[in-house]
């Protein structure tokens, strides 16, 4: 990855609210399935914005910190996804998205961020990201002091 895209908590909440607007009316949804772990925070934000209380998870392991590896399904939500919004933070190459589509063919699959290779696999997303960009999510970062530019020697 040659570029980094840093996401702040404020940006994430703004993007989630934009996505929630597109998912109205809420009456069409039975619940949300969050793709663990990346989709947990966006799913919580969407659940709040849409007033949805039925939230389940599908647990798929595909990354070891910053390296992609083989997919491993750890836990699956029941059903074919009918009436459910499946939420992940991003769609990258589409590996996880393909598995999600097979497990939940009737679900509405959304992400906050989408890269070109995976974009066709989601029903909706908010932000286009170049394929060669690494996304730094706010839950993966700590807050630290950075000295002013004029203090650097």
Curated annotation (Swiss-Prot):
Q: Where does GMP bind?
A: 69, 92-96, 134-135
A GO cellular component entry from the record: plasma membrane
Return the InterPro entries for the record.
Answer: PRibTrfase_dom, PRTase-like, Xanthine_Guanine_PRibTrfase
Which superkingdom?
A: Bacteria
Any Pfam family the entry gives: Pribosyltran
EC numbers: 2.4.2.-, 2.4.2.22
Gene3D superfamilies given for it?
A: 3.40.50.2020
Q: Where in the cell is it found?
A: Cell inner membrane
Q: Which cofactor does it need?
A: Mg(2+)
Per the annotation, which location comes first and is thus the protein's main one?
membrane
- Residues bound to xanthine: 92, 135
Name the protein family.
Answer: Belongs to the purine/pyrimidine phosphoribosyltransferase family. XGPT subfamily.
Instruction: Name it.
Output: Xanthine-guanine phosphoribosyltransferase
């Amino acid at each position: 990855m040659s570029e980094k895209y840093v996401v702040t908590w404020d940006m994430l909440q703004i993007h989630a609210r934009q996505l929630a607007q597109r998912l109205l009316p809420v009456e069409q949804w039975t619940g949300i399935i969050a793709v663990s772990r990346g989709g947990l925070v966006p799913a919580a934000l969407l659940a709040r914005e849409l007033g949805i209380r039925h939230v389940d998870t599908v647990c798929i392991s595909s990354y070891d910190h910053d390296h992609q590896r083989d997919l491993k399904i750890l836990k699956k939500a029941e059903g074919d996804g009918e009436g459910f919004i499946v939420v992940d933070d991003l769609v990258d190459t589409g590996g996880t998205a393909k598995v999600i589509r097979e497990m939940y063919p009737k679900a509405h699959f959304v992400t906050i961020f989408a890269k070109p290779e995976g974009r066709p696999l989601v029903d909706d997303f908010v932000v286009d990201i170049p394929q060669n960009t690494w996304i730094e999510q706010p839950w993966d970062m700590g807050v630290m002091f950075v000295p002013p530019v004029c203090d650097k020697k």
